[in-house]
């Protein structure tokens, strides 16, 4: 015939075919055969069908995960899942939650993707932001619930800039797939005006606080007290404090990416970790029965599970389950949940440095100190002969305005101390693992600086010491007459000071200075100072199964005199020397 057949290039794969290929890779390398079987069984039992295509609806997902209706977060969670389901073609979002899409969602949310995409794709912050963001609130669209709406939704989203450019996670997925043509998707335009609505993020934070202590098979409805009454109020309070780190709701309608990324990296590195055990619920099918063989008619009895330690054995006027969850966003939850024990309570053991020393100093494990109080009014408003004027006089004359505008609002600070407590003579104690943080009314974090070692001091009252007390980030007392005559408490650039009576405290943030024991805030780039009258404070350390008792004494009389509510100390189990964070 003499004709040479020209080589025909294979037609490029469609988005659907590439997504299916990626889902197969994830399924093979990121799941066990039992997990895949369970996922298929769960999906089969939950899926609705349209045009012979199975998919999950918003209400179905929320009901299966037992998301409390009082949180009103189902739509936000479904929007996030539907966006991630379109990966790596995020311009196709929102996607229908079919079986393959659920494989992709679970792989990404639980961080299993690292087994395939490698270290290059270690951070999914951009993906999470885009999954929660809207690009024009006026035309914001709900997530797709059925296949028939999918095409129309894609057309509406169109080319308004669906994502932030240079997403390493997306690029790593294209590299893993090896489809050169797919890399054209790298050139998506950057999003303009993309932001997460503050109200949506508040709802999600409440859910994240709720799921933070859960294991893979724990249910969201296992502790109904957390979403009713005082438990619900504490969830809302913690969520408002965390939201305030991202956004001033009175000035901005939403959270932009640069702020989102900055706060997550600096203050809340573990914020989204609770989503992993939540979505792993899809990998546990209730239909699996390992106690029954083929053809067996008799089912062997199932041994009841061993009782678990409570999430928090002791609560107080500061410490509760929501505060514990909030701290787990920057201290690993494995250090906190079911591991902390009350060491010292001021309203039970007495408000004195001696009582504190007796209860805490023999503890040889890390501790957490929490302090709560009410902001003092301006110095000019105090004309009494009480202790307030004396406290004001002990502070250096250089004063900063408060960190927020609310008069008389509750303030809460804390310190994570890795080393055991000891008396301070000429040198402070503590190490670079020490963390100074604020919990209310705004969440903030001040990590230790390696340049200055004035981390923690505990100074007893004595004739040679003009000011006793507990301080963090302040220089230790000096044995000189000039120091004693000054009558001033030396405050560090970033520091927390509690006076010797545990009646007053002062937090200082000198943003313009450098060389302090703690780094300045990544959230508030300005100077501020909080002078407060202490209402409650506690410090913490936990230890395996060792229990620390508390006893009542005459501390309540002093509590009324000082208008204090409580004081306590918490501790956790001893860590191996290599365990740092």
From Swiss-Prot:
Residues 539-581 are annotated as: Disordered. Residues 317-540 form the TLDc domain. The keyword Transcription regulation does not apply. It comes from the Eukaryota. InterPro entries: TLDc_dom (IPR006571). The keyword Cytoplasm applies. Its main location: cytoplasm. Keywords: Cytoplasm. It is found in: Cytoplasm. GO terms for cellular component: cytoplasm; nucleus. Residues 557-566 have a biased composition (Basic and acidic residues). It holds the Pfam family TLD. GO terms for biological process: response to oxidative stress. Belongs to the RTC5 family. PANTHER family: NUCLEOLAR PROTEIN 7/ESTROGEN RECEPTOR COACTIVATOR-RELATED (PTHR23354), RESTRICTION OF TELOMERE CAPPING PROTEIN 5 (PTHR23354:SF130). May be involved in a process influencing telomere capping. This is Restriction of telomere capping protein 5.
